[in-house]
């Protein structure tokens, strides 16, 4: 936080500064006008470019929307065909009843699965019980009295 100390200019320095600003003044005004003109030209060019980009994007977007609408119309037509043929497909499915042969096959598979489950259960249950050792215990077991 330094404190700025104002230094007073001597009359000679003030005169030099005033003459310098007076001599440069008209040049600055012209440069400002030129920059204003160039700036307006640049702004106009930017605005035109932005408008062209926007029109290009909107055109591309319109083409993409049209393609999406066409695809959607095709999908909707296909879905309508499927829905229109649905009653006939259901009728065909009803007429093709499963034969009793298939029923016996499914019953046999179910019985085999149940038998396999019973065998697996008995094996697991047997393995959870420890088998008694054929050897006598190494330590004499005496009841406490």
Swiss-Prot record:
GO BP field: cell division; cell wall biogenesis; regulation of cell shape
Topological category with respect to the lipid bilayer: Single-pass membrane protein
Keyword Acetylation attached: no
Sequence intervals crossing the membrane: 104-124
GO annotation, cellular component aspect: plasma membrane
Domain of life: Bacteria
Pfam families from the UniProt entry: CwsA (PF10814)
Localization of this protein: Cell membrane
Cited InterPro entries: CwsA
Keywords: Cell cycle, Cell division, Cell membrane, Cell shape, Membrane, Transmembrane, Transmembrane helix
Family: Belongs to the CwsA family.
Free-text function comment from the UniProt entry: Required for regulated cell division, cell wall synthesis and the maintenance of cell shape.
HAMAP family assigned: CwsA
Subunit structure: Interacts with CrgA and Wag31.
Entry protein name: Cell wall synthesis protein CwsA
Species name: Mycobacterium tuberculosis (strain ATCC 25618 / H37Rv)
């Amino acid at each position: 936080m330094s404190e700025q100390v104002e230094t007073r200019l001597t009359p000679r320095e003030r005169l030099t500064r005033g003459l310098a600003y007076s001599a440069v003044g008209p040049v600055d005004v012209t440069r400002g006008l030129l920059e204003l003109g160039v700036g307006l030209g640049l702004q106009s060019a930017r605005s035109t470019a932005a408008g062209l980009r926007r029109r290009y994007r909107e055109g591309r977007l319109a083409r993409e929307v049209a393609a999406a609408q066409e695809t959607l119309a095709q999908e909707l037509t296909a879905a309508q065909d499927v829905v229109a043929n649905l009653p006939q497909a259901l009728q065909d499915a009803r007429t093709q009843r499963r034969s009793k042969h298939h029923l016996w096959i499914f019953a046999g598979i179910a019985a085999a699965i149940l038998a396999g489950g019973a065998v697996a259960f008995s094996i697991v249950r047997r393995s959870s019980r420890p088998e008694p050792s054929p050897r006598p215990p190494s330590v004499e077991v005496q009841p406490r009295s």
